[in-house]
Amino acid sequence: DKNSSEVWGGFRVGRRARVTLLKDSPNEVEAWHDGFGSLGRHRRKFTIDKDCFRIEDSVSTGVKAVSLIHLAPDVEIMSCSRTEIVTNIAAIRVAGASSVEIVDDQVSFTYNRFHLSKTIRIHFVKRLSYTIG
């Protein structure tokens, strides 16, 4: 697994990711970063409207990438496919995924105290978008 800055043993030892803000408006934010080095630039766009929240990812090279959605402990997954994840809160419609997996995870609610939760791992190459709502 790669992180967006080069890290070793919990200490940053490599160069920091360079982030460029492309758009910042009340309903849309878009930026890219080069923190994956030779793996290319990662570009992400967030769009919100009255009915949904949309996230679009693109990676400049053809590497296999993973987008993570960390769920709150009270969110339950009702069904999951490569194109749609249904929870007890909302539906997530996915376009561009090569696969989707649900993994057990933990979220910290205070120092050194955790709740069990789920994380959605969406695997893709080049482009991915998902809409929540």
Where are these regions (language model features)?
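C-terminal structured "cap/appendage" subdomains that terminate the fold
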Residues: 85, 89, 93-94
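Short stretches within intrinsically disordered, low-complexity N-terminal or propeptide regions
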Residues: 19, 33, 92-93, 99
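Beta-strand-rich recognition/accessory modules
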Residues: 62, 93-133
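Catalytic and substrate-binding regions of extracellular carbohydrate-active enzymes
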Residues: 1-81
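N-terminal functional modules and adjacent low-complexity/disordered segments of proteins
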Residues: 31, 66, 87, 104, ...
